[in-house]
Amino acid sequence: MFARAVKPHDGIIMFRAFVYDNHINETNWKADRANAAVDFFKDLDGKFDENVVVQIKYGPIDFQVREPVSPLFSTLRNTSTAIELQVTQEYLGQQTHLVYLAPLWKEILDFDLKADDRPSKVKDIVSGERFRRPLGGSAGVVNVGTNSTWLGSHLAMSVGL
């Protein structure tokens, strides 16, 4: 609905794909929370308008310090996607430590999901190149506060730059 309304104005809709709980039974130790977004979105692949980009968190859980790359990147082959990167440091010492995130981002973007046993680096998927999609991109998530530095630290804003 929104995509069609903004299309005449060359508008793009970013649809955030964060699925926190897709009816997973927490008492079942074999339930796969990391696959919840795939379960939710796999049947929607190709059903979004061409001016919609599905924004996917780099990992399937929730910006944990170390987590695998989201399998949703290689699942949505007929839908334009963007990667959502963590800039905020809520899980990385609450901004009481200096954390340089560029190596983490590089590792994620260079990760090869090997879709169909072919090279499928995350950076090639979100650029639109791997699955020949017209759109793609990246987004950063920050927690902006009300103090003089906005992010709680004089260096926090420079971490992602």
Model-assigned labels for residue ranges:
Residues 2-161:
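Substrate-binding groove of N-acetylhexosamine-processing glycoside hydrolases
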